[in-house]
Amino acid sequence: SLENTLKNLKRDRVDIYMLHEPMYQLLSCNEWAIFLENLKKEGKIRYSGLALDANNLLDFIKNSKTKLFDILQVNDSLDQQEANILIRNQLPLQITYGYLSSAKKRGVDFLNILKKIKIRNNNGAIIVSSNNYEHIKELSQV
C-alpha cells in the first residue's frame, strides 16, 4: 500500500505512484479517478502513472472517460515499435523500456540500439537494465 511505502521510505510524498499491469475493467470506475485525485490533494503523490504493455494500454486510451494517469510507461522495441500506440493517439513517449532484451534476442549491438532509442524517445525516460557491469559502464557513456 502507499501508506506502507511512505512509511518505509520515511517520506510524506512520492513523485510517481505507478500501477503496473492493471486490468482496465478494475480501474474503469470513477472511484479510481477520485482516489488518485484525493492522493494528489493530500500531497501524498505528485503524479499517477500506469505501466503496461502496448496491447493492454489501448483499453485505457480508448475507453477512459477521464484522464486517470499523468505518466505512461510502455514497452517498446525498434523493430516492433509498440509504443507507437501512444504517438497514434497524440500522446508523448514518456517512459519506455524493453529495448535491450529485444535487441539481444536478435543479436543486435546494444550500444547502437541505445543511440537509436535516444533519438526515438528524446524527451522521455528510457529504462534499460543489465546485470553485466561492463554493459552498465558502456551504457552510461551513450
What is the role of each PLM region?
Residues 1-8, 84-89:
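Short amphipathic alpha-helices and their capping/turn segments at secondary-structure boundaries
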Residues 6-27:
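Active-site groove signature of glycoside hydrolases
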Residues 20-142:
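Beta/alpha (TIM)-barrel catalytic core signal, keyed to glycine-rich beta->alpha loops juxtaposed to Asp/Glu
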